[in-house]
Design a protein with these regions (language model features):
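Flexible, acidic/Gly-rich N-terminal and inter-domain linker regions that tether
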Residues: 1-71, 75-80, 84-101, 304
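Short Gly/Ser/Thr- and Asp/Glu-enriched loop/turn motifs at secondary-structure junctions
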Residues: 53, 121-123, 295-299
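Short, acidic Gly/Pro/Ser/Thr-rich loop/turn segments
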Residues: 65-68, 185, 257, 310
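Hydrophobic, Leu/Ile/Phe/Ala-enriched alpha-helical segments that form helix-helix packing faces
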Residues: 95, 99, 103, 208-211, ...
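Surface-exposed helix-capping loop/turn segments at secondary-structure junctions
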Residues: 106, 216, 289-291
Length: 336
């Protein structure tokens, strides 16, 4: 296995990623920091009862994706595809050790309650959403099973273009997010930009039809871009896709003009919160649902039938007492 491109690895480390194994990575979420420092919660706390200081944001493949979405603010991924089969237990334990390393500086901060910081050392939620397309990790099912056995929820975010992988998962995530960012094939090809597979929209469509059969919580997430996918006609087309998928929830989240996406989109593509709410109020009745909540700081609205907290599994396995903390890493320095 060749491993991660060194130039990309250097960029990610500069952005405070802790690289785990050949392709995995962990990064402290903005809202984890906000929870520790100012007792603020992200929208997952308001919508699903997720405590931000207990959430670990990671990906088994931070450098691998089969799409090149215009709205993605992450660094561009590798141009070649290299599937990873890292041992799930190693990935989980090293990710937790990395999370502890990333949070270590908060332990001595007088603004951070000591008990809360100690509680954060053992995550209760794993957001498999940091970067890349996690369904490219060949042992994803085993990894999520281990998370559940350690008393942690899993929140998997996928672009939905690999339906066979999702269909064959022996262990499903606690909550499965599918990015539904285009209402039709034309917008999909323009916005999501498949790298290799010309049938990506067809595969994505297969995933939508698969979702109703999956015994887990399903979320369809629409990333809203003004002037691109928010017209009244787009809303009708999105609603048709949502009715096929029949998710528990629909999240309407506004695009943010940050990171690499600034090379593809403009600040004018950022919808206001009022525009996000207008979209949500229009799509809700078309899907037989209602607007349940919203979060202005996170630029998102929730559509569904009712809010139910995400269930945390009872642990049957425990981290070793001597698991410890990942060592500090000397970042790569690449020539300009």
């Amino acid at each position: 296995m060749a491993g991660m491109d060194l130039a990309l690895k250097a960029k990610l480390q500069k952005q405070r990623y802790h690289i785990v194994g050949e392709h995995g990575g962990v990064k402290t979420c903005h809202w984890t920091k906000e929870s520790l420092l100012r007792d603020r919660q992200c929208y997952k706390g308001k919508f699903y009862g997720v405590k931000s200081h207990n959430c670990m944001q990671m990906s088994p493949v931070v450098d691998q994706c089969n799409l090149a979405c215009t709205y993605c603010w992450r660094e561009p991924h590798m141009d070649t595809l290299e599937l990873t089969d890292q041992d799930p237990k190693e990935l989980l334990y090293e990710s937790v050790r990395a999370q502890r390393r990333l949070l270590s500086g908060f332990g001595g901060n007088p603004k951070v309650p000591r008990e809360k910081w100690l509680d954060a050392q053992n995550p209760k939620h794993v957001a498999i959403s940091l970067n890349g397309e996690p369904t490219l990790y060949t042992r994803l099912s085993e990894y999520m099973d281990l998370c559940h056995k350690h008393g942690m929820t899993t929140m998997l975010v996928t672009n939905g273009t690999l339906p066979k992988v999702i269909e064959k998962l022996d262990t499903l995530p606690t909550q499965l997010y599918v990015s539904v960012d285009a209402p039709n094939k034309k917008v999909f090809d323009e916005v999501c930009k498949p790298k290799w597979n010309t049938n990506a929209w067809d595969k994505f469509s297969e995933t939508l039809d698969l979702l109703p059969s999956l015994d887990t919580r399903i979320v369809c997430r629409h990333t809203l871009m003004q002037g691109i996918n928010m017209s009244d006609q787009h809303i009708k087309e999105f609603a048709a896709l949502d009715r096929r998928a029949d998710p528990d929830y629909i999240e309407n989240k506004g695009y943010v003009f940050v990171g690499h996406s600034r090379e593809n989109l403009g600040v004018e593509n950022m919808p206001s919160h009022e525009e996000i709410m207008d979209f949500s109020n229009k799509i809700a009745p078309l899907t037989g649902r209602k607007v349940l909540s919203d979060s202005r700081p996170s630029r998102v609205a929730l559509v569904g039938q009712e809010i139910t907290p995400i269930p945390i599994p009872e642990p049957t396995m425990f981290f070793p007492k001597d698991l410890g903390i990942a060592p500090s890493v000397k970042h790569l320095q690449m020539a300009n």
